[in-house]
């Protein structure tokens, strides 16, 4: 999905990426409903269930009582650390911030803006897939209408969290 969005935005020169991503949301949601017949899919492997329900015992830390961390929390923390390092300590990460700040200036400085945008949208699709696997493992089902009508909640959370509509700044958290 992310690759599709990235290519669509760069090749079709969409005036605003929000239009493309919202449009593909409905396309892929409809496709999911067609494939599943509108019914939840269940019977996932133990590995997928482990992503949603698994726990890591912290007794090896010398705690008197057995305490646990959810596998999903550990996975998300690892992904956050990797992406923080990627954004703050790699050339591509710096380019992402530059493109968010001013794509024309980034293009003028020699950055292949379209290539980086496709990479960014592909990474977003990958991260959405990780989130979907965790949710499927947690509920032991792939519900085709999961997240229905939560688009506004997601946008509001980003705004309240301090995301800039104008780009050029931001953090993994």
Say what each PLM segment does.
Residues 3-12, 34, 85, 89, ...:
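Membrane-interface helix caps of multi-pass small-molecule transporters
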Residues 1-25:
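Alpha-helical transmembrane segments within multi-pass membrane transporters and channels
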Residues 113-125:
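Start (N-cap) of specific transmembrane helices in multi-pass transporter permeases
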């Amino acid at each position: 999905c992310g690759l599709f969005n990235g290519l669509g935005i760069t090749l079709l020169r969409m005036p605003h990426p929000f239009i493309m991503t919202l449009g593909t949301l409905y396309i892929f949601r409809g496709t999911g409903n067609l494939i599943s017949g509108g019914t939840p899919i269940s019977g996932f492997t133990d590995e997928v269930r482990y992503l949603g329900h698994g726990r890591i015992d912290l007794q090896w830390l010398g705690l008197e009582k057995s305490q646990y961390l959810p596998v999903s929390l550990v996975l998300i923390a690892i992904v956050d650390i990797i992406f923080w390092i990627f954004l703050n300590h790699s050339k591509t990460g710096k380019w992402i911030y530059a493109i968010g700040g001013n794509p024309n200036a980034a293009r003028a400085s020699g950055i292949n803006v379209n290539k980086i945008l496709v990479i960014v949208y592909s990474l977003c699709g990958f991260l959405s897939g990780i989130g979907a696997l965790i949710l499927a493992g947690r509920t032991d089902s792939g519900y085709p209408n999961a997240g229905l009508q939560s688009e506004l909640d997601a946008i509001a959370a980003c705004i309240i969290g301090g995301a800039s509509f104008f780009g050029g700044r931001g953090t993994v958290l």
